[in-house]
Amino acid sequence: MHKLLKLAAMGTAACALLAGMAPVANAQEKQNVEVLHWWTSGGEASALEVLKKDLESKGISWTDMPVAGGGGTEAMTVLRARVTAGNAPTAVQMLGFDIRDWAEQGALGNLDTVASKEGWEKVIPAPLQEFAKYDGHWIAAPVNIHSTNWMWINKAALDKAGGKEPTNWDELIALLDNFKAQGITPIAHGGQPWQDATIFDAVVLSFGPDFYKKAFIDLDPEALGSDTMKQAFDRMSKLRTYVDDNFSGRDWNLASAMVIEGKAGVQFMGDWAKGEFLKAGKKPGEDFVCMRYPGTQGAVTFNSDMFAMFKVSEDKVPAQLEMASAIESPAFQSAFNVVKGSAPARTDVPDTAFDACGKKAIADVKEANSKGTLLGSMAHGYANPAAVKNAIYDVVTRQFNGQLSSEDAVKELVVAVEAAK
């Protein structure tokens, strides 16, 4: 009944939602899209300007609806409230299973026309298509491929530690100990559940892509309750000892700033963090180092920002299709992702304009896609539905904060996931 109410609210909102959005041919009135997103940090906002300007050049005005919060949780809360109130946005930045949830309600538009014409099927990796399509139809336009198993290291601090990038767990711990001896915070981290889970993503992946897939994508109880999972929690406990006392509630971009300013040695974060370094005028290889979390080389846990369009009347569809087409154009994919810090959602975009970290990201995604190790990120909504993700978040955060032992965390993880399925 709740879903029906949502859809009814959307139906009544369709006309009012995009009022004033006339065809391009009507010079007196621009087409318009109202866009809900959570790209509010410096680097992210700069990237968003690329899309705004691209659409404006095509005669489509942009009404901005930003909601702060790096994981998108707050944005989805606002979206639910807007839809319930009968006032849904035109286009919404979404991740993974959130897209499927709205598609199952029949709330999203159909992008097949533009997708077929432009051959999206051939150039967008299959793991992304699992979320950009529903029941055989394109429902969302992937903007990028962010990978989450990155480390962002202050170059000066690394040089003081000998300059060697860690390739395994023991070398990572030795580096963190060195950072501590230098008098800086070893790990810049924000104590928010999605950030805790981002680290856990990488830690679990370091035990191998097969284990990660069994645990977080297949939700295999044996993997979730295994000794390997206990080892992963043990490593989280160890990493917790390298975080400063003021980490609770810190936004991710403020943690990035700690590394940028030399106050911390490393941040474990997706490649959206690179946008913060670039915004601060820092250069890869000179001021900071980007590398995969030790033990995850050759595999990529991804999330992909996508824009899903809500159903509107036929006269409003051209603007939505124009926006989708603009998002998937190779020129935009390059320009946007160079600024955003991510890899293009298309595999045919040249890496010419990208910096060293960007070139590595593109190469890593291609390698992982060909090897079957391009895996949806648990922490960012591409491994399992929101209920399961949130159940995992709860256990991971409590364990990271010392409220659960590793043994108890493993037991609770199995129970929590089973209950949330």
UniProtKB/Swiss-Prot annotation:
It is found in: Periplasm. Residues 1-27 form the signal peptide. Keywords: Periplasm, Signal, Sugar transport, Transport. It comes from the Bacteria. One of its GO terms (cellular component) is periplasmic space. Part of a binding-protein-dependent transport system for a sugar. PANTHER family: ARABINOSE-BINDING PROTEIN-RELATED (PTHR43649), BINDING PROTEIN COMPONENT OF ABC SUGAR TRANSPORTER-RELATED (PTHR43649:SF28). Belongs to the bacterial solute-binding protein 1 family. This is Probable sugar-binding periplasmic protein. It comes from Brucella melitensis biotype 1 (strain ATCC 23456 / CCUG 17765 / NCTC 10094 / 16M).
